[in-house]
Amino acid sequence: MAKQRVINIRGTSGSGKSTLIRRLVELYPEKEPVHVPDRKQPLFYKLRGDGLLPLSLLGHYETACGGCDTIPSMDRIYELVRERLAEGDSVLYEGLLISAEVNRAVALHTDGFDLTVVRLNTPLELCVDSVNQRRWAKNPDKPGVNPKNTEAKFKQTLATCKKLDAAGIPVVEADRDGAFHAIKQLLEA
C-alpha cells in the first residue's frame, strides 16, 4: 500500500491556492466529485491516476474561490480529513480560513499522520493585485480591496506556519511554481 500523505496549502487571499489546486488536479485523469445530501456542490473529489497517490481533494472548485472555505466549519474540515484517511486516501486541502488554524493540524501530526504544510510565499503586492483582478472580473466598477485585510492574513499565515514548524510539522515555503513541483513530488506513489 502506498504511503498516505496529508498536504495543506496555506496562503493569504490572492496567493494562488485555488489556482495551484486546479493545476495539481490536472495531474489526475480520474476525477470523481462526491456529493452529499443538502449540498449543491461537491464536498470533495476523489482523484486517481497511475503513479500517483489516491487523493481526496476537500471542498469544491466550481467558483473562483474554493476549497475548505466552502465547507461550513473547521471541525467538519478536519473530520473529513480523518474520514478520507480512514478510507485509505491521501488528502489535499486549502483555504483562507484554514491558513490560520494550528491546533487541529498539530493534532493530525501528533496522531502520526504524515502532514506537510506548503506556504505560498507570493509577495503581498501580487496577492492584492490578484484579489483585485478577480474582483474586477466580476464587476469592473468595484473599488480595489483594502490591502490591510490581505496584509493581516499574510502575517497571520506566516505566524501560524512558524508555530506548525515549531511543532515539528514540515513547512515548505515556495512560490507558485515551486509549490506545484514540491506537491507533485509528494503525490508520486
UniProtKB/Swiss-Prot annotation:
Q: Name one GO biological process term.
A: symbiont-mediated evasion of host restriction-modification system
Enumerate the InterPro entries for this protein. P-loop_NTPase (IPR027417)
The highest taxon in the source lineage is Viruses
| tRNA processing keyword on record | no
Q: Which UniProt keywords apply?
A: Host-virus interaction, Inhibition of host innate immune response by virus, Restriction-modification system evasion by virus, Viral immunoevasion
Reactions catalysed, as given in the entry:
5-hydroxymethyl-dUMP in DNA + ATP = 5-phosphomethyl-dUMP in DNA + ADP + H(+)
Q: What does this protein do?
A: Phosphorylates 5-hydroxymethyluracil (5hmdU) into 5-phosphomethyl-2'-deoxyuridine (5- PmdU) on DNA as a step in the pathway leading to thymidine hypermodifications in the viral genome. The phosphate is added internally to the DNA polymer. As a final result of the pathway of hypermodification, 5-AcNmdU substitutes for a subset of thymidines in the viral DNA. These modifications probably prevent degradation of viral genome by the host restriction-modification antiviral defense system.
In the record, the note on similarity to other proteins reads: Belongs to the thymidylate kinase family. 5-hmdU DNA kinase subfamily.
Q: What is this protein called?
A: 5-hmdU DNA kinase
Organism the protein comes from: Pseudomonas phage PaMx11
Task: Kindly list the organism's lineage.
Answer: Viruses, Duplodnaviria, Heunggongvirae, Uroviricota, Caudoviricetes
